[in-house]
Amino acid sequence: MQPGLELSDHIATITLRRPSAANKLSPEDLPALIAHIDRINQADDIRVVVLRSEGKYFCSGYDISEVRNSQNKGSSFGEMVDAIEHCRAVTIAVVQGGVYGGATDMALACDFRVGSTDAEMFMPAARLGLHFYQAGLERYVHRLGLDVAKRLFLTCERLTAMEMKGCGFFTHLATPQELQAQVDELTATLSAMAPLPLFGMKKHLNLIARGLQDSEAIARDVLRTVQSEDLQEGGAAWREKRPPAFKGR
């Protein structure tokens, strides 16, 4: 079954729905996921995206036998992951059980990664004879650092949940029983923020991490928030000690 999409209030949820195969992704899943991200980007009211999966495992990556076919068709796994990273809304990956192969890059493309203490990760590309794609290599280095990237890609070492938290793969860690509460808390926090600075700072922080910062674009986005109704609302809510009602303008 292809990944599902649910939109509710300010939150979009993308769910991987192939638990019997450890949520391994197939060729038809790639354009489906890209289409979900496109729809989210067009929904002005969506502020947070939760990427999750059914069953014991988050995702076992992509069917290795389909890698060549997906490249030839022009809709590669890497393009799908890039779409997740460039999503306008803030993204949260909810990782339980195992996250393997390309699925590790899917998670790294998200802004936050909330992991269960029963999780583990494994990048078997070198063991399988596959050279990972450029954007994925870059993401590993930007997010985790060169030494950790080499450790994972070149030795194919498995990491426990605690090791994943220690190296920065997980931004949050919770027991299986507390995982959903942790996700709900983070989602509520993010969805309550003012959309203009939330989206703008996410975008520019990612560009800065890649050495692609645009000073003029940052200045324009700063000015846009200074002139926004939401800045006035935020100040009023602070003075009146009430939750702000941001409108994204």
What are the functions of these language-model segments?
Residues 83-129, 158:
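Glycine-rich beta-to-alpha active-site loop
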Residues 138-147:
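Hydrophobic, secondary-structure "cap" segments at the distal end of domains
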Residues 1-54:
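Conserved CoA-thioester-binding segment of acyl-CoA-metabolizing enzymes
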Residues 156-163:
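Acidic, divalent-metal-coordinating active-site segment for phosphoryl/phosphodiester hydrolysis
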Residues 4, 31, 45, 53-86, ...:
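Glycine- (often His-adjacent) and acidic-residue-rich active-site loop
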Residues 236-249:
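Terminal low-complexity tails and localization/encapsulation signals of metabolic enzymes
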Residues 114-119, 170-216, 229, 246-249:
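C-terminal long alpha-helix characteristic of the crotonase
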